[in-house]
Amino acid sequence: MIIPALDIINGNIVRLYQGSYCMQTNYGEPISLLKEYIRQGAKMIHLVDLDGAKNPLKRQSLLISQLIKEANPLSKIQIGGGIRNASDVEILLESGATRIVLGSIAVTQPKIVKKWFEYFDPNTLVLAVDIHVYSEENRKVAIYGWQKETDLQLEQIIEEYYTVGLKHVICTDISKDGTLLGSNISLYRSICHAWPRIAFQSSGGVNKLSEISKLRSSGVAGIIIGRAFLENTFTINEAISCWQNE
């Protein structure tokens, strides 16, 4: 599945270069673009509330609810940014979101988040893992918008949640995100082979249509694409065709 990404700060779509709030490009208001992405055939949109991710008190709740309503029933919404408790998850699911993305909190408070996997349908929860890749044996998890690197390895965090029914994982190679420098195909091939029952989504760096067929061949269930669509490197329609023709 091709999953367009919309990252939102202060009501506008932005792209951050390698996660830096200081290096952002503004692409205007999100509703018309969301409608255009759906018109082109997007069946799922990946929304990130970057204000909420930075400060839960600044979550853009009204705008997020509006975007979810605009998308339903033609497209599903996968939403992340500032999820801090079970109530946040519940409210978003009740408002019509299909999947809720859990990032840093899944790393810092695993005991609490594992209970969410028992309380909610695990199909509605997505573990987002951002990693620094030093080698195939050394892939360290980063948290808090990539500002802090942990000693935790990628496989450790996946195994932790695999025991409670983990179904969906977004894995981002930090060095690629927002760069249009190409995807880390070997990373996705490796993790899809290691955990065949998990639906992995690749994230970061896609810069040409030929990469889509390579990523699909790696075993990923979805490809999150942000900047390439915003800058018209290729269209959603073209990307979907590449995915379907693989």
Curated annotation (Swiss-Prot):
Superkingdom of origin: Bacteria
Listed Pfam families: His_biosynth
Enzyme class, first EC level, given as a word: isomerase
InterPro entries xref list: Aldolase_TIM, His_biosynth, HisA_bact_arch, Isoase_HisA-like, Isoase_HisA-like_bact, RibuloseP-bd_barrel
EC annotation from Swiss-Prot or TrEMBL: 5.3.1.16
Catalytic residues (UniProt): 7, 130
Cellular component GO terms held in the UniProt record: cytoplasm
Keyword Cytoplasm applies: yes
One GO MF term: 1-(5-phosphoribosyl)-5-[(5-phosphoribosylamino)methylideneamino]imidazole-4-carboxamide isomerase activity
Entry keywords, A to Z: Amino-acid biosynthesis, Cytoplasm, Histidine biosynthesis, Isomerase
Pathway terms, separated by semicolons: Amino-acid biosynthesis; L-histidine biosynthesis; L-histidine from 5-phospho-alpha-D-ribose 1-diphosphate: step 4/9
Reaction catalysed by this enzyme: 1-(5-phospho-beta-D-ribosyl)-5-[(5-phospho-beta-D-ribosylamino)methylideneamino]imidazole-4-carboxamide = 5-[(5-phospho-1-deoxy-D-ribulos-1-ylimino)methylamino]-1-(5-phospho-beta-D-ribosyl)imidazole-4-carboxamide
Compartment(s) of residence: Cytoplasm
Record GO biological process: L-histidine biosynthetic process; L-tryptophan biosynthetic process
Classification via NCBIfam families: 1-(5-phosphoribosyl)-5-[(5-phosphoribosylamino)methylideneamino]imidazole-4-carboxamide isomerase
PANTHER family for the chain: 1-(5-PHOSPHORIBOSYL)-5-[(5-PHOSPHORIBOSYLAMINO)METHYLIDENEAMINO] IMIDAZOLE-4-CARBOXAMIDE ISOMERASE (PTHR43090:SF2)
HAMAP family for the chain: HisA
Similarity comment: Belongs to the HisA/HisF family.
Protein name: 1-(5-phosphoribosyl)-5-[(5-phosphoribosylamino)methylideneamino] imidazole-4-carboxamide isomerase
The gene coding this protein: hisA
